[in-house]
Design a protein with these regions (language model features):
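Walker A/P-loop
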Residues: 1-13, 43-82, 97-99, 127-132
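Short glycine-rich substrate-engagement loop in P-loop NTPases that contacts/grips substrate
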Residues: 34-39, 76-109, 120
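Conserved AAA+ ATPase "sensor/coupling" helix adjacent to the nucleotide-binding pocket
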Residues: 156, 169-185
Length: 220
């Protein structure tokens, strides 16, 4: 059943934050120091010269979204692991798939969310595949990678620092959700200026918190 079939029943829809996830750099709001034209990520994607990176920034700033956009723009196989629930076995399984892909001439991206939660042995398991180009690693972390990622792995990655969303970016994200989401756009939802400002200020630059709060407030 499609989103269009489910639009009248929000309980059957994916979470709003997932529905509103952009899939191109052009649609991505914020982090213009990385994604604007002629900036590092935009230039790397345009040149199809992908490199391993650590995305370091606060919650809800777009780390996972950027990783997925990068993978789609360069036409690579995308494997996603959470360091909270994955171990060395999962890493090796992903690398085995990436090695098979490479033999077919297809690149692979391994995205590891909360990479700072991997211990030394788990991070060590990534080294050879990163060094040999079997995988392009994208790690996401809220913690300073200089302290949480082992030096040999860190030296093979470019650290990209992301920032919390500005109030202006959050306002754009809010308006986009209200006007473009298949469900919310049918509800004629309006905010008083004071209520809108309170909502934007309450989420501390976190777009995910904003969309979650919007979803909750419009469902009760």
């Amino acid at each position: 059943m499609s989103l269009f079939n489910n639009a009248e029943n929000p309980r059957t829809l994916p979470p709003l934050a997932e529905r509103m996830r952009p899939n191109t750099l052009a649609a991505f709001l914020g982090q213009q120091h990385l994604v604007a034209e002629n900036r590092l990520l935009a230039k790397a994607i345009k040149a199809d010269r992908l490199f391993s990176i650590i995305l370091w920034g606060p919650p809800g700033c777009g780390k996972t979204t950027l990783a997925k956009i990068i993978a789609s723009q360069v036409d690579a196989h995308f494997y996603e692991l959470s360091a909270v629930s994955s171990g060395v076995k999962d890493v090796r399984a992903a690398m085995a798939k990436a090695k098979a892909n490479r033999e077919l001439g297809k690149p692979s991206i391994l995205f590891i969310d909360e990479i700072h939660r991997f211990n030394k042995a788990q991070q060590d398991a990534l080294l050879q595949a990163v060094e040999n180009g079997i995988i392009t690693l994208i790690g996401a972390t809220t913690e300073n990678p200089s302290f949480e990622v082992i030096s040999p792995l860190l030296s093979r990655c470019q650290v990209l620092k992301l920032t919390s969303h500005s109030k202006e970016d959050l306002a754009s994200i809010l308006e986009h959700a209200l006007s473009e989401d298949l469900f919310l756009s049918t509800q004629n939802i309006q905010f008083e200026d004071k209520g809108r400002d309170l909502l934007l200020e309450s989420v501390s630059g976190d777009a995910r918190r904003l969309l979650n709060a919007l979803e909750i407030s419009t469902s009760i």
